[in-house]
Design a protein with these regions (language model features):
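Membrane-interface motif at the C-terminal end of an N-terminal transmembrane signal
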Residues: 17-36
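Buried hydrophobic residues that stabilize the cores of well-folded domains
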Residues: 38, 62, 66, 98-104, ...
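Flexible, processing/modification-adjacent segments and terminal tails
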Residues: 139-202, 207, 232-233
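Gly/Pro-enriched, hydrophobic low-complexity segments
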Residues: 195-281
Length: 281
């Protein structure tokens, strides 16, 4: 076969592959928008009170944090919170650049995260979705958005354990919309010392974060003290650092997050460091 014909065949195959990958990503995007419409359309807006006088039992470092984060604001309109993020994911199978986004309910532990993992910084290798809607979960990851390598498939006990972690995960990101950390039927605060407190899940959900505050009254770390069920049936302990606080629409929030997960032997399993590019309330 002539070289020119061989090149045409190769070019044709590459074109088909690129089209198939594009179709896969578009299909996933459409699925994600349908899920977002299903779980994050709040309907009529309502106002959330930020009056700390309603919470006389807040531990001292927690109260100081809210005073810092709220900057004197007394209320906020409840809307879904959207943000874009970009970072690096270090997995046991390799290192990836991630472009991600998340939408969260403003006052309930519901969120939808989606992201594309790039190999070498340019090849869209993996597409992932993680949706938690309080007592349900829709998670999957696909190579080139076609070949599933992770899905929601747990026995009832493991699923319950996973939901405990996913609820905490929501609150670990809620430092970007701090009114969601006020006490309610889903969680409460318990004192530890002058610089730390526990954020404790309530009701059917079980688990807690040890939360550390700095001298500027910022939350700088939220960590689980024990391993918890994560995606892909892994038991891991999470340490999440919150950095680079900025004033966003009148609230002080961190714009860099650094997560590290450890296995039962306390060996580092995974890292995800990312910067928040945009937050919309």
């Amino acid at each position: 076969m002539e070289l020119g014909k061989i090149l045409k065949v190769i070019l044709g195959l590459l074109t088909i592959i690129i089209l198939l990958i594009g179709i896969g990503f578009y299909s996933s995007y459409s699925e994600n928008r349908a899920l977002e419409d299903q779980y994050f359309s709040l309907g009529e807006e309502r106002v959330i009170s930020l009056d700390l006088e309603k919470y006389p039992d807040l531990p001292k470092p927690v109260r100081r944090y809210f005073e810092y984060a709220f900057q004197g604001k007394k209320e906020v309109t409840a809307r879904p919170i959207h943000w874009q993020e970009k970072g690096e994911f270090l997995l046991p199978v390799g290192e990836f650049v991630v472009n991600g986004s998340q939408v969260s309910r403003p006052n309930q532990p519901l969120y939808q995260w989606e992201g594309v993992y790039y190999k070498g910084g340019w090849l869209p290798f993996l597409e992932s979705r993680d949706v938690f809607y309080l007592y349900g979960h829709n998670m999957r990851a696909k190579i080139f958005s076609w070949f599933a390598v992770m899905t929601t498939n747990y026995n009832p006990e493991d699923e319950k354990q996973l939901h405990n972690y996913l609820a905490l995960r929501y609150y670990g990101t809620a430092v970007k919309f701090p009114w969601a950390l006020l006490p309610d039927s889903y969680k409460k605060w318990e004192p530890k010392n002058e610089n730390q407190a526990y954020l404790v899940l309530q009701g059917d959900l079980k688990g807690r974060y040890l939360v550390t505050f700095n001298e500027q009254n910022q939350i700088i770390r939220m960590e689980t003290e024990d391993v918890m069920m994560h995606g892909n049936h892994e038991w891991l302990r999470e340490v999440g650092e919150k950095k680079n606080y900025k004033l966003v629409e009148g609230f002080y929030v961190p714009t860099r997050m650094e997560y590290t997960w450890y296995d039962r032997e306390n060996k580092r399993n995974t890292k995800y460091f990312f910067d928040v590019l945009e937050i919309r309330y």
